[in-house]
Amino acid sequence: MGISYSVEADPDTTAKAMLRERQMSFKHSKAIAREIKGKTAGEAVDYLEAVIEGDQPVPFKQHNSGVGHKSKVDGWDAGRYPEKASKAFLDLLENAVGNADHQGFDGEAMTIKHVAAHKVGEQQGRKPRAMGRASAWNSPQVDVELILEEPEVED
C-alpha cells in the first residue's frame, strides 16, 4: 500500500512530494500552504527564503488573535515569520523539484497545483517541574503534501 494524497494527480503532467510527521506548527503550515499555492516552484522558494530572512511576512488569516500587524503583508494586516515551518517547506519544494527533474519536467517552472498540511498527532514529551512533578510538553506533528503541475502551453 502506497502513500495516499488527498487529491488525484495525473502522473503524465505532475510531480509529487510529501513530508511525513515533521515537528512543526500546524497553524504555521496552514498559513504557508495557503500563501504558496498557485505560485511557481521558483517563486515559492524565493518567497520562503525571504520569510526565513525576515524580509517578507506570512499573512495569518486564521488563528491571528494577538498576531502583530506587518506593513509588508499584501491585502491583510496580521503576519509573522515562521522560520521553522518555512525551512521544512523549502525541503519539501527541493524534493518536489528534484522529483520533477527526474521525471523530465522543468521543476522550477512548474506551478504548485495542490499543497495541504494535515495534523497527524503529537510526539509525547515531559518537562520537569517543582516538587518532583512533570508536565506534558508535547510537539505537534504535521504531514504536508505538495503536487507540482506543468504550466499549460498557450497556442
Curated annotation (Swiss-Prot):
Entry superkingdom:
Archaea
Q: What GO terms in the biological process aspect are recorded for it?
A: cytoplasmic translation
UniProt entry tagged with the keyword Ribonucleoprotein: yes
Alphabetical list of PROSITE patterns matching this protein: RIBOSOMAL_L22
Sorted alphabetically, which keywords does the UniProt record give? Ribonucleoprotein, Ribosomal protein, RNA-binding, rRNA-binding
Q: Which GO terms describe its cellular component?
A: cytosolic large ribosomal subunit
Among InterPro entries, the record links this protein to:
Ribosomal_uL22, Ribosomal_uL22_CS, Ribosomal_uL22_euk/arc, Ribosomal_uL22_sf
Which Pfam family name is an example for this entry?
A: Ribosomal_L22
A molecular function GO annotation: rRNA binding
Q: Which NCBIfam families match?
A: PRK04223.1, uL22_arch_euk
| Free-text function comment from the UniProt entry | This protein binds specifically to 23S rRNA. It makes multiple contacts with different domains of the 23S rRNA in the assembled 50S subunit and ribosome. Contacts all 6 domains of the 23S rRNA, helping stabilize their relative orientation. An extended beta-hairpin in the C-terminus forms part of the polypeptide exit tunnel, in which it helps forms a bend with protein L4, while most of the rest of the protein is located at the polypeptide exit tunnel on the outside of the subunit.
What family does the database annotate?
Answer: Belongs to the universal ribosomal protein uL22 family.
| Subunit structure comment from the entry | Part of the 50S ribosomal subunit. Contacts the macrolide antibiotic tylosin in the polypeptide exit tunnel.
HAMAP family under this entry? Ribosomal_uL22_A
State the protein's name.
Answer: Large ribosomal subunit protein uL22
Question: What organism does the UniProt record list as the source?
Answer: Haloarcula marismortui (strain ATCC 43049 / DSM 3752 / JCM 8966 / VKM B-1809)
